Amino acid sequence: MALSKNRIKYIRSLELKKNRKADKVFLAEGPKLVGDLLGHFRCRFLIATSEWLSAHRHLTVEDVTEVSEEELSRASLLKTPQQVLAVFEQPDESVDVSVISRSLCLALDDVQDPGNLGTIIRLADWFGIEHIFCSPNTVDVYNPKTVQATMGGIARVKLHYTSLPELIASLEDI
């Protein structure tokens, strides 16, 4: 099946937060990142080159489209497309605040650069931190640049957007 213009338009629309939020999805690109996320998030659809698909015959994704490198480059948000891209469903962000008392967590206030947030998530993953609490003004975790910069850490570190003063006040009750 060829990649339709509507699907390309949809993928490219996921660069905008309002579109990601409306459909509760996010975009991931590249063999390592997509490979890491496949085991952690539900995949809506996957687009890949025949080379990548032949190396990953075990896929359980229902909606898979085989494309040429040229077709992939039309859909990709990257300057240099990397064999595969996938659209995943965003997980539920609810959390029991008592998790803070049982584990090391981070709180981030007003981080604006997607690459910086992705790097923080990647480092948190390396140190075994499972939860990051972000102020509402922090950049969207599902921004394609953030997802790319996490290098898969987004699969293991959960981000929660909340009012940090309210979160800190609620900790006094724990």
Question: Which positions does each model-derived feature cover?
Answer:
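Boundary-proximal intrinsically disordered activation/regulatory segments immediately upstream
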Residues: M1-S54, T138-V139
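Short active-site oxyanion
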Residues: A22-V25, R42-F45, E62-D63, E130-I132, ...
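Structural motif
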Residues: L27, I47, L85-V87, L106-A107, ...
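Short loop/edge segments at beta-strand edges and connector loops
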Residues: A28, A48, E66-E69, P136, ...
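A residue-level signal for conserved active-site and pocket-lining positions in enzyme catalytic cores
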Residues: G30, A86, V147
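Phosphate- and divalent-cation-binding pockets in alpha/beta enzyme and binding domains
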Residues: D36-L37, A55, R74, N116, ...
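Glycine/small-residue-rich loop that forms an oxyanion/phosphate-binding "nest" at active or ligand-binding sites
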Residues: H56, E62-D92
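RNA substrate-binding interface of SAM-dependent RNA methyltransferases
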Residues: V97-I174
